[in-house]
Amino acid sequence: MGGISIWQLLIIALIIVLLFGTKKLRSLGGDLGSAVKGFKKAIGDEELTVKKDNTEADADFEQKTLSKEEQQSEDPVQKSQKDKEQV
């Protein structure tokens, strides 16, 4: 009723082909396709860069963990002396 039917779309397509010709429409379609392909490639490259950045570590050092025995065996006096030595 208020929408565009298939026949109206076919008539519009026929008018466009008559106005521009098939060669110009082919080249226009090829240009549009290459633009979309380039856009997808750029988006894919950006995603790879983001994934690569996320997997790299911020710094090159190893995380050290103390076992429970080592943590309990340290004396509070020794801890304060170590803290003073580090400053």
From Swiss-Prot:
Under Gene Ontology molecular function, one entry of this record is: protein transmembrane transporter activity
Q: Which InterPro entries match?
A: TatA/B/E, TatA/E
Q: Does the keyword Transcription apply?
A: no
Name residues in a coiled coil: none
Q: Does the keyword Transport apply?
A: yes
GO terms (BP aspect) = protein transport by the Tat complex
UniProt xrefs under NCBIfam families: tatAE (TIGR01411)
Q: Which HAMAP family match?
A: TatA_E (MF_00236)
Subunit and partners: The Tat system comprises two distinct complexes: a TatABC complex, containing multiple copies of TatA, TatB and TatC subunits, and a separate TatA complex, containing only TatA subunits. Substrates initially bind to the TatABC complex, which probably triggers association of the separate TatA complex to form the active translocon.
PANTHER family (UniProt xref): SEC-INDEPENDENT PROTEIN TRANSLOCASE PROTEIN TATA
By sequence similarity, the record places it as follows:
Belongs to the TatA/E family.
What is the name of the protein in this document? Sec-independent protein translocase protein TatA
Q: Which organism is it from?
A: Photobacterium profundum (strain SS9)
Q: What is the lineage of its organism?
A: Bacteria, Pseudomonadati, Pseudomonadota, Gammaproteobacteria, Vibrionales
Point out the gene that encodes the protein.
tatA
